[in-house]
């Protein structure tokens, strides 16, 4: 759909003629989207036909090592490069994938990206949703965000929205596809 209105903080004062900052926070200030990006990890798995919401998985911390292609894979804590935790380091035990989304579990997002699909497939879908490139909105200056996808920790973090940055406008565009059955 079209953007009909746009607003941001009340820092603009029409009575002040000398304006030092014309930054549009929605298009020019990238940020780590956090859990709002998990929707697209789940969407990639669903669209690939590999998602079973009732399938059980490990909802505890996701400790990881690497495979032969330097992608993150689940490992034991004492034989890992590091661990990703859920909020408050809570250990959920065995949960299904739907519950992983409901509770916004980082560990389940990592499992979906690294075991149900692959980090490369997830990245491909994020690009299709319009992340890491201009939205190309008429007349608005834009930042593209930053993609960190070099190390296993970067790839794992991308599944739950950390380590890379996007803009609010990119996120709105991507969610418009989710709410419109895939049409942006």
Q: Language-model features: where?
A:
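Beta-lactam-recognizing serine transpeptidase/beta-lactamase-like catalytic domain environment
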Residues: 2-29, 40-184
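Structural signature of Gram-negative outer-membrane beta-barrels, strongest in the C-terminal barrel
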Residues: 30, 34-36
């Amino acid at each position: 759909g079209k953007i009909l209105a746009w607003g941001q903080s009340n820092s603009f004062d029409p009575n002040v003629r000398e304006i030092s900052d014309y930054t549009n926070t929605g298009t020019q200030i990238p940020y780590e989207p956090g859990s709002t990006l998990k929707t697209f990890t789940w969407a990639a798995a669903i669209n690939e036909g590999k998602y079973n919401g009732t399938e059980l998985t490990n909802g505890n911390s996701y400790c990881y090592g690497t495979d032969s292609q330097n992608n993150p894979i689940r490992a034991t804590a004492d034989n890992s490069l590091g661990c990703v935790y859920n909020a408050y380091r809570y250990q959920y035990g065995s949960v299904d994938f739907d519950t992983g989304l409901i509770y916004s579990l980082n560990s389940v997002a990592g499992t979906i990206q690294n075991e149900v699909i692959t980090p490369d497939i997830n990245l491909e879908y994020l690009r299709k949703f319009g992340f890491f490139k201009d939205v190309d909105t008429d007349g608005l200056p834009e930042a593209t965000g930053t993609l960190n996808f070099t190390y296993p920790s970067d790839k794992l973090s991308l599944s739950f929205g950390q380590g890379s940055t996007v803009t609010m406008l990119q996120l709105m565009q991507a969610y418009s596809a989710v709410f419109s059955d895939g049409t942006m």
